[in-house]
């Protein structure tokens, strides 16, 4: 969804966006069918991808590492060596002013709530970057 927002804003040339899992459970899997369905209903194009494992190199390479929930943040910190010295690791909803965990549709079955959470967080993140980078 962040890629979609960046593209809609005409800012794709300013970003390199990637996605990675913090656990091995979903490695190699495509997005969940419920996610795919919700994106189609919202007319947001799906970018084909399969889950890959986050690595310590991601911390060195990317400016922002965004997790959906507290468990993601804990796993990301572990993967990157146990600390976040450069303050690159964030919970997505921090950018919406909430800081709570994204509602996980795996447990809730509520893809609409998750969509709203992710859209709010991604919109806030894009606003922050645009403001800080003057783009």
What is each model feature region?
Residues 1-61, 127-135:
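Conserved active-site segments centered on acidic
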